[in-house]
Amino acid sequence: MSEKIVVVDDEKEIADLVTTFLQNEGFSVQPFYDGTSAIAYIEKEAIDLAVLDVMLPDIDGFQLLQQIRKTHFFPVLMLTAKGEDLDKITGLSLGADDYVTKPFNPLEVVARVKTQLRRYQRYNHSTASPTVEEYEKDGLILKINSHQCILYGKEVFLTPIEFKILLYLFEHQGSVVSSETLFEAVWKEKYLDNNNTVMAHIARLREKLHEEPRKPKLIKTVWGVGYIIEK
């Protein structure tokens, strides 16, 4: 069965181009030209991945991403304008898994889609039995087998990337983990010095796990070194 992908871009030519290239790779693809139609479809169908443009005519791509992340874990790839670093950081902090800058080569989109699907499938279908079933600290319980995060008795929705970041920090509890180490462990890619991906995801995690994100008690920053969950 081919993976089902949603492509959302108000520029019909771009949406149709990306759709065609993905279909040529064997994916089942549904294009949309506005966010409202896309979210209605996503709520009815089992989607494996979404490609979202930031600029949409009704609701913007960030709002659409937030709607998706309320109930869905599947990977999301954002399309951003050239040079708009703020868009990239915002998208990643809201739960996007990757981004492509316009103008782009459709083959790059295809490659990134395949990469995200492979990661998601490994995440969902891993059969390895962890030596530790859960981690607990200061009212938070991270359940490894069920991929759940419980904070003071209430479940906190984490994206697959957020869960893996938190798990890696717990696995190395008491040690400072650099952004480079964390990125290469979670994303399985080479880290670049100007990469803000880890920082954006840590900020998002803190918003979900701390009453005062600017004064984090769980995930602490060791300036110039990295991040730590203390023992």
From Swiss-Prot:
Gene3D superfamilies: 3.40.50.2300, 6.10.250.690, Winged helix-like DNA-binding domain superfamily/Winged helix DNA-binding domain. Residues 132-231 bind DNA. Keywords: Activator, Antibiotic resistance, Cell wall biogenesis/degradation, Cytoplasm, DNA-binding, Phosphoprotein, Repressor, Transcription, Transcription regulation, Two-component regulatory system. One of its GO terms (cellular component) is cytosol. The modification 4-aspartylphosphate is found at D53. GO terms for biological process: regulation of DNA-templated transcription. Its main location: cytoplasm. Residues 4-117 form the Response regulatory domain. Induction: Expression regulated by upstream promoter elements. Part of the probable VanC-type operon associated with vancomycin resistance. Phosphorylated by VanSc. CDD domains: trans_reg_C. Member of the two-component regulatory system VanSc/VanRc. Binds to the promoter regions of target genes. Activates the transcription of vanC1 and vanXYC in response to vancomycin which results in vancomycin resistance. This is Regulatory protein VanRc. It comes from Enterococcus gallinarum. The gene is vanRc.
